Amino acid sequence: MFLNRMMKTRTGLYRLYSTLKVPHVEINGIKYKTDPQTTNVTDSIIKLTDRSLHLKESHPVGILRDLIEKKLNSVDNTFKIFNNFKPVVTTMENFDSLGFPKDHPGRSKSDTYYINETHLLRTHTSAHELECFQKIRNDSDNIKSGFLISADVYRRDEIDKTHYPVFHQMEGATIWKRTKADVGVKEPMYIEKIREDIRQVENLLNKENVKITVDDDTIPLKENNPKQEYMSDLEVDLCSQHLKRSIELIVSEVFNKKISSMIKNKANNTPKELKVRWINAYFPWTAPSWEIEVWWQGEWLELCGCGLIRQDVLLRAGYKPSETIGWAFGLGLDRIAMLLFEIPDIRLLWSRDERFSRQFSKGLITSFKPYSKHPGSFRDVAFWLPEDKPDIHQVHENDLMEIIRNIAGDLVESVKLVDSFTHPKTGRKSMCYRINYQSMDRNLTNAEVNTLQDMVCSKLVKEYSVELR
């Protein structure tokens, strides 16, 4: 059995080593033309596009998504759910429609997986934001409406226990349509609706077993986090109240689930209170903007960014000027899932090992129990940069990460820069990276590690003309 598993892994590695110098690639059943000047998506990344971990009801990411959706919709079932968007989007959807400048670093090939010049793997769920705003605008006659998007997103990144080229985001929004006050009525109906919505959320918060304690010094608004002119002071006050209580409801729900699990298992240091705090922030699509942090295991942890929707976002979605007001939020599901389920290595989220998957059940937040700890094997790759390309950016760190990831996949636990040296006489620059080869479910032999290391070194020389040391 061990031999068969090893042979399958080795075969897969050699297949992944080949780069995508082909005229077409197929992703989710659709063929796309490639471009030798632009295409940088790899076989290893394409293989992840159909995993959809956020849709698996007994996977930590799927469990968390489901808990949040159900809790938010337990108030008045306002949110339309969008969880099935495919990961390939256009540059228009991912960047242009959201106002990204042409020189924005997020567009760089060093950060983004391009299929060709016009298509890429989405880098955020906001690529579908305008479409969802348009859907709730066209489908709803109610004063209040909203949506939730969850999806896998893709970014070229470093390799360590908390970073992976694919992760999962959730974002959501709520809007209210402005209405005029009836004759003889003090406030318009939409203002009454927001007040009632706030009361409903507060009632749910009061029913939680461990009550949430909130520290909020963002009120009144600060000069560096001002309101937008299209909203009145009353609208900002009520809309921000509803936003903050809704986000607090999410935090209270998932952390109460965690605390209940800790009590059941008689865990040490089970919290007796749940403290959160609001801090001022900046985001391109909201103003004013905030972040919420939770006090957990002796430190403040950032959980979610949010704010009141900028008017230009609503206008791009087809709403008329001053027709609506609302709020939006965004959070990373993987990071919170790793925290709540006590998962030490992000690679585990992608494991197909039943020893991992059978530990989790729909609707429950339980602690991951490690089933093995195999030793790592360190290898250094040191090289001189080409003499005619002394700038380190000629070999972007994310390019090195992609070479390693595409060859070794999840058999690499981390890659770290351990030395950078410029020769005092020649001026040549040398880099040294330390690779920790460590499987999550079996021991790697020295022969396997050496083969992987040789492949990495050969590919690095071939692609970037470096000189190995």
Swiss-Prot record:
GO terms for cellular component: cytoplasm; mitochondrial matrix; mitochondrion. The keyword ATP-binding applies. Keywords: Aminoacyl-tRNA synthetase, ATP-binding, Ligase, Mitochondrion, Nucleotide-binding, Protein biosynthesis, Transit peptide. Substrate binds at residues 126-129, 155, 162-164, 169-171, 302, 329. GO terms for molecular function: ATP binding; phenylalanine-tRNA ligase activity; tRNA binding. Gene3D superfamilies: Bira Bifunctional Protein, Domain 2, Ferrodoxin-fold anticodon-binding domain. CDD domains: PheRS_alpha_core. It catalyses: tRNA(Phe) + L-phenylalanine + ATP = L-phenylalanyl-tRNA(Phe) + AMP + diphosphate + H(+). Residues 1-17 form a transit peptide. It is found in: Mitochondrion matrix. Its EC number is 6.1.1.20. One of its GO terms (biological process) is phenylalanyl-tRNA aminoacylation. PROSITE patterns: AA_TRNA_LIGASE_II (PS50862), FDX_ACB (PS51447). Residues 372-469 form the FDX-ACB domain. NCBIfam families: pheS_mito. Is responsible for the charging of tRNA(Phe) with phenylalanine in mitochondrial translation. Present with 1800 molecules/cell in log phase SD medium. PANTHER family: PHENYLALANINE--TRNA LIGASE, MITOCHONDRIAL, PHENYLALANYL-TRNA SYNTHETASE. Belongs to the class-II aminoacyl-tRNA synthetase family. Monomer. This is Phenylalanine--tRNA ligase, mitochondrial.
